[in-house]
Amino acid sequence: MVLVGYFVLVISIKDLVTHKIRNRTLLYFLSSLIAFSLFSQNAHVNPFAGACFFTIFTVLYLLSNALHKSGGIGFGDVKLIGVLAFAYFDSGLRSVEIFFVSLWLALVAHICLHLLICRKFPYRIAMAPDIFLASGLYLYAPIGLLLPQ
């Protein structure tokens, strides 16, 4: 858990500063999650969920860049969601729906905080902290929604 917290901090701070998520950092994060799942009995890895979330968010990435020339979701964010889905999420439409709602709640909170602090609408948003927050909300959701996890 400490290792995951380390990667959450490193990736979030780097994304807040540079608006980029390095592939090398994501590979180290994925490797540590795989190693953790091999040595832990209660960890589950779902490659299908990782591929499913990665595909859905890749389509969103392509649509957002095709419809809005200044960009939308970054591909580093798509890869981060794929890595987190590989380790923590379930596959299925209900899981995608819960993660979407969690991500939108985190993004709205991020934008509102930015508006309150800076008094202007942000041109670009570092989404890594919001993705990690949405993942936490997603993992907490089955308790309230009685979903299998």
Describe the role of every protein-language-model region:
Residues 1-149:
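A membrane-topology feature that recognizes alpha-helical transmembrane segments
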